[in-house]
């Protein structure tokens, strides 16, 4: 059996999580069209009879504005250490500019084999894709190949998976074959809730939100009770998330509940509360402990 750890590197919103979801054939990682959706380092495990790949999905590498952003970048860079392969993802719409070269520098410093991935090729013409291909070829050291993909359409995904497997060594099975992530249910539930907030709110609001699961308990009737606090920076943001007559929080709750029910295979009662925690994105205790980034910073 071939096995190994494969990290994804790229600036925010290039489609790293969508690529992993497309490869494993199911939605494990939350996605949205807004940058910096992924905050924590997440392992997604893809096992067949022939291989086990542990995808290490990371926050986008960017110039941070808050302490939260600093920790996100540290988590992403930390994930590049000690892996067997890196997928360096570029958005075909954006091309290769200063932010991409910022990512390339970190990847090159790792001295790890990498595969260049040009994602969202369905949104640009072939000439631009070829230009990006050449820029990646000339910029990425230890590059074993470049694959053109559209994660949303599934284009290039099989070719990418084949190239990943080709570049892994024979090794042990690290996780049980039925395990798809090393994150607990509390983390997955909080991510699903946060994804729905990203889908329904705009501008600064989604980036100002932290979701903390306070309680998970199976009730006597077999329903899984989940109580979650949604923290925001300001009262105005609280009002937006609650919505007129509570319509927004109701929509977020209904959509999140359905997805969590699909995840656990049973009924869920989702109890959401919105609270103001002023300037939480600059408070180390909250970032490291309550939203769980302390473990993400370990090498």
Curated annotation (Swiss-Prot):
Region of interest called G2, as start-end residue ranges on this chain: 36-40
Chain positions covered by the region annotation G1: 10-17
Membrane topology label: Peripheral membrane protein
Pfam families xrefs: KH_2, MMR_HSR1
Region (G4): 119-122
Region (G3) residue spans: 57-60
Domain Era-type G stretches: 2-170
Residues that coordinate or bind GTP: 10-17, 57-61, 119-122
Major localization class: cytoplasm
Keywords, comma-separated and alphabetical: Cell inner membrane, Cell membrane, Cytoplasm, GTP-binding, Membrane, Nucleotide-binding, Ribosome biogenesis, RNA-binding, rRNA-binding
Subunit record text: Monomer.
Protein name per the record: GTPase Era
Organism: Thermosipho africanus (strain TCF52B)
Gene assigned in the entry: era
């Amino acid at each position: 059996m071939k096995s190994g750890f494969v990290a994804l590197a790229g600036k925010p919103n290039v489609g790293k999580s969508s690529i992993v979801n497309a490869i494993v054939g199911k939605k494990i990682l939350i996605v949205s069209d807004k940058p910096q959706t992924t905050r924590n380092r997440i392992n997604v495990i893809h096992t067949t009879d022939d291989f086990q790949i542990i995808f290490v999905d990371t926050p986008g590498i960017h110039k941070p504005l808050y302490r939260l952003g600093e920790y996100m970048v540290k988590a992403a860079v930390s994930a590049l250490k000690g892996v067997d392969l890196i997928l360096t993802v570029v958005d075909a719409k954006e091309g290769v500019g200063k932010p991409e070269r910022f990512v390339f520098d970190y990847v090159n410093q790792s001295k790890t084999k990498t595969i260049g991935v040009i994602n969202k090729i369905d949104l640009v013409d072939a000439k631009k894709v070829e230009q990006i291909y050449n820029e990646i070829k000339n910029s990425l050291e230890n590059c074993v190949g470049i694959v053109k993909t559209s994660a949303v359409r599934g284009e290039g995904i099989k070719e990418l998976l084949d190239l990943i497997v080709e570049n892994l060594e024979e090794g042990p099975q690290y996780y049980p074959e039925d395990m798809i992530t090393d994150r607990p249910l509390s983390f997955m539930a909080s991510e699903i809730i946060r994804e729905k907030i990203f889908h329904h709110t705009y501008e600064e609001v989604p980036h100002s939100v932290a979701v903390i699961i306070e309680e998970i308990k199976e009730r006597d009737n077999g329903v899984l009770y989940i109580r979650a606090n949604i923290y925001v920076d300001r009262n105005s943001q609280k009002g937006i998330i609650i919505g007129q007559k509570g319509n927004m929080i109701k929509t977020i709750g209904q959509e999140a509940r359905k997805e969590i029910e699909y995840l656990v295979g049973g009924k869920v009662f989702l109890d959401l509360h919105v609270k103001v925690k002023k300037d939480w994105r600059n408070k180390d205790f909250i970032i490291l402990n309550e939203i769980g980034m302390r473990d993400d910073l370990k090498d």
